[in-house]
Amino acid sequence: MSLQAIIYNEDKLLVLDQLLLPYERKYISVSNVEDAFAVIKKMQVRGAPAIAIVAALSVAVGLKHLSEDADAKEYVINSFEHLKQSRPTAVNLFETAKFMQGIALQEGKNCRNKIIQEAERMLVKDLEDNHNIGTAGRKFLLQHYKDKDKLTVLTHCNTGSLATSGYGTALGIIRSLHESGNLEHAYCTETRPYNQGSRLTAFELVHDKIPATLVTDSTVASIMHKIDAIVVGADRVTRNGDTANKIGTYNLAILAKHFGKPFIVAAPFSSIDTSLASGSQITIEQRPPIEMTTITGPIITDSNSRNLEDPKRVRISIAAPGIDVYSPAFDVTPANLITAIATEKGFYTQQTNNKYDFS
């Protein structure tokens, strides 16, 4: 059974609480826009595509419960303005808000059914797009390594079924390679400080029985001789190809460049923000210090981390009290370090000026 981060059925929306993974699976009911804002802000749902889908579906659910005499246009516009504040770096959310608000302005008070249809369409289209992204990335890598049948690939953060409607973007490339028999091995970084790699990506790889190894973020340079390519997702790609993604992505791009290995960004075309000329214009979200200075998990009683004494999670401090904390959620990787960008429309490579052209 495939993992589902989002379950939607008519007027009911459920999201998998990713803060509890990998030890506990619990779905949270999202009944309105405020619920959606909360699960996005708290990172109970994360990943740029999933954030946009949950936001859109929460508005759809709200519209289904909105009284007939209420102003649907005003509701849609105000709801998306509010939701945009939940994660300011995720361009998919902003693009979805712009699109849906445009429909509301065009259709006026009669926008209800159109908004609901478009939100539901997003859920279906995202899954289809993810399969196409996986195929595009796989084809690029196999063309790059014409003399190799099996590749070893490293990924960062979580870009799989838990970050999308299903299959994933960068993890979708790994899945596509695995399905075609072209994956030798996958490596995933733990992705400090929120550990999306060790909690979520490792969980997906084990679930799908994909041969994989978890490594610390600081291990990557020492294993680059084993790695054929690095694949990552994106929260926002600017017009020239600069890419904002989970903190630590920039480090990996520098390593890939140093070792002469392909560095692939995988993202739906909706993650490309052509209104921004370069990465210097991207707003970088700062996370609360407690996410870096503490760690959360269940109590264990043996050295193999397998015997869970109590599934209840506890939070413990791991930093000196009083230390100042700088914890950006994302960094920006310059376009000249990116070998290719895989989208549902195919893959894009650098132009002669080391920049990208998405026209």
UniProtKB/Swiss-Prot annotation:
- Where is this chain's protein located in or outside the cell? Cytoplasm; Nucleus
Keywords from UniProt, A to Z, are: Amino-acid biosynthesis, Cytoplasm, Isomerase, Methionine biosynthesis, Nucleus
Q: Which GO terms describe its molecular function?
A: S-methyl-5-thioribose-1-phosphate isomerase activity
Pathway assigned to this chain's UniProt record: Amino-acid biosynthesis; L-methionine biosynthesis via salvage pathway; L-methionine from S-methyl-5-thio-alpha-D-ribose 1-phosphate: step 1/6
Instruction: Just give the chief location class.
Output: cytoplasm
User: Where does the entry annotate site (Transition state stabilizer)?
Assistant: 157
Gene Ontology CC annotations of this record: cytosol; nucleus
Q: What is its EC number?
A: 5.3.1.23
Q: Which reaction does it catalyse?
A: 5-(methylsulfanyl)-alpha-D-ribose 1-phosphate = 5-(methylsulfanyl)-D-ribulose 1-phosphate
Q: What is the top EC class of this enzyme, as a single word?
A: isomerase
Instruction: Output the NCBIfam families linked to this UniProt entry.
Output: eIF-2B_rel, PRK05720.1, salvage_mtnA
Protein name as it appears in the record: Methylthioribose-1-phosphate isomerase
In the UniProt record, the gene name given for this protein reads: mri1
